[in-house]
Design a protein with these regions (language model features):
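Intrinsically disordered, low-complexity non-transmembrane regions of multi-pass membrane transporters
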Residues: 1-25, 54-69, 237-266, 509-512
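Interfacial/capping segments of alpha-helical transmembrane domains
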Residues: 46-72, 187-190, 289-298, 369-374, ...
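Membrane-core helix-loop-helix motifs of multi-pass transport proteins
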Residues: 20, 149, 153-244, 260, ...
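Interfacial loop/helix-cap signal at membrane boundaries in integral membrane proteins
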Residues: 14, 53-87, 201-209, 286-306, ...
Length: 512
């Protein structure tokens, strides 16, 4: 998938080619997750022989390794396997969203929209716009992670770039930019919910608030956008080379780049319907007692139907313009056409569903056995006697490594906050800055962590454009983003620390 010239190129390219070669020797992702489950079970059996334990930093309860290869372990497997699969966090969301996105895709709405964007937008703004949307998309949860990569892939083809470059750039922007945004959003509320009680472990006088990282996360957008753009234009696009459309999956359809009068008419009204839908959503959310707000607090972010129902919102937001375009362009002439599109959209997720079955078991094994918690606590304790820049680097590295074991941001910070926050308060750091350090460390390995539930989805997307695509090749195009984010963002945190600038309103670096 790399050009011959690039294969013989720089040290960086040779390194990435080696990563790709090694990664491609890995089994199919579903088999890989199964083997990881087996390996994890064996590991818990071995560790349990040594009676390894830790004290939970929040409850102070002693936590032991639970052996999966035991009576209780086998009982858990029998009782919970199907539940683990059906309750997998991303499964229902992805399948529901794909109903709406599938109609918009199958009718040709997305394709014609991309052609229209390419024809009208200045070429130099297309890539920065995709990156910015990806970074800011975390405000609406995981929406950008699902929607943006396939849109970017189609757009990259239209402007003459390799679609995999678009997929990986959009994905890296969406998941790697979780700790960057110009507004306070769901991620801020999520981490704050753990930081506040962790602060109270050692102090009742330190004030915290949900927006206490705002200055830093807003400034991070300015730092991340050019970083991701540079990696894409200087490394990923040249490395992937010219796209060979013969590699495209047989059932992937490409339409003409020409827009007919009928299609232009349908596209105009589809776009209008999209805008009207968004406006109606905003108007509905404005009233103080809107059903989209938290009934008790009135918040639109904290446990609000607006955020909890984001999957349904995405479905509707894309289904409506897809239907309008399909009806006006005559792509949908009966309910049978619509039903067929629904089925094809969900059917295209078959590979993802199989991978999810095994990935769900791996996550459940880590949680049930307590291995994830013990690894996090043991690692955090290594940092207790450090300070300053060394401590910042240590927490970023540990958070990044824990992210490779535990995918859920709330699960990780729920474990680490009761350790990091009190520990750094004692050293002299305000909880707001501790939270920033964690969020950066958590974000930088998001593009490459196998625990991210959307990585299998990205692989499914990629295989539509390259039938030979394997996980190793995909990771080799994602790794440069993680490396670049690690270097640039860590340096940015350290510079911010040395300057002593507050990370947000009510969020100083040091405890006064």
């Amino acid at each position: 998938m790399t050009s011959k010239h690039q294969q013989k190129g720089s040290i960086v390219n040779r390194f990435l080619n080696s990563v790709e070669k090694i990664g491609n020797k890995l089994p199919d992702p579903s088999v890989l997750f199964f083997l990881m489950c087996v390996g994890l079970a064996i590991m818990t059996w071995v560790i349990s022989l040594f009676n390894v334990s830790v004290k939970h930093p929040g409850t102070h309860q002693t936590i032991y390794i639970k052996n999966i290869i035991s009576h209780d372990g086998f009982t858990m497997i029998m009782n919970d396997t199907i539940k683990n699969f059906s309750e997998f966090p991303a499964l229902g969301l992805v399948l529901a969203v794909m109903i709406g996105i599938g109609v918009a895709e199958k009718t040709g709405y997305f394709d014609k929209l991309m052609i229209s964007v390419v024809n009208r937008a200045p070429r130099f703004l297309i890539l920065p716009t995709i990156i910015l949307i990806g970074i800011l998309g975390s405000t609406a949860g995981d929406a950008a992670t699902i929607i943006l990569p396939p849109l970017a892939a189609m757009l990259f083809i239209k402007i003459g770039y390799h679609p995999i470059a678009g997929l990986t750039m959009a994905y890296a922007s969406a998941v790697g930019g979780f700790a960057a945004n110009i507004v306070v959003g769901m991620q801020d509320a999520l981490v704050y919910s753990f930081t506040e009680p962790a602060t109270r472990i050692v102090s009742d006088s330190i004030k915290t608030n949900v927006a206490m990282n705002w200055y830093f996360i807003a400034a991070s957008v300015v730092v991340l956008l050019p970083t991701i753009l540079l990696v894409t234009t200087k490394l990923i696009i040249p490395r992937l080379g010219k796209y060979d459309d013969s590699l495209m999956h047989d059932d992937h359809e490409e339409t003409s780049s020409h827009i007919t009068d009928k299609e232009a008419h349908a596209l105009k009204w589809a776009n209008i319907s999209f805008i009207v839908t968004i406006i109606l959503l905003i108007i509905t959310a404005i009233p103080e007692h809107s059903f989209l707000r938290n009934a008790k607090t009135g918040s639109l972010l904290d446990d609000a139907p607006l955020i909890n129902g984001v999957g349904l919102i995405i479905l509707v937001v894309f289904l409506i313009p897809g239907l309008v375009y399909g009806i006006l362009s005559k792509e949908i002439q009966s309910t049978k056409d619509l039903g067929k599109m629904f089925g094809e959209a969900v059917g295209s997720m078959g590979t993802f569903i199989v991978i999810v079955f095994f990935a769900a078991q791996l996550l459940a094994f880590l949680k049930w056995s307590n291995l994830g918690i013990i690894a996090a606590v043991k690692g955090a304790k290594l940092l207790e006697h450090q300070n300053g820049i060394v401590l910042i680097l240590g927490i970023i590295i540990l958070s990044a490594l824990v992210n490779l074991l535990i995918g859920s941001a709330s699960a990780k910070w729920g474990i680490l906050a009761p350790i990091f926050v009190p520990m750094l308060i004692i050293v002299g750091f305000h909880p707001a800055f501790t939270q920033v350090i964690y969020r950066v460390g958590d974000s930088i390995t998001n593009p490459i962590t196998p625990m991210m539930p959307y990585l299998p989805l990205l692989l499914t997307y990629a295989q539509k454009y390259d039938k030979r695509m394997k996980l190793g090749a995909l990771l080799s195009s994602l790794m440069p983003y993680s490396i670049a984010l690690s270097i640039v963002w860590t340096a940015f945190v350290i510079i911010w620390f040395l300057l002593g600038i507050p990370v947000g309103p009510g969020g100083p670096i040091f405890v006064k």
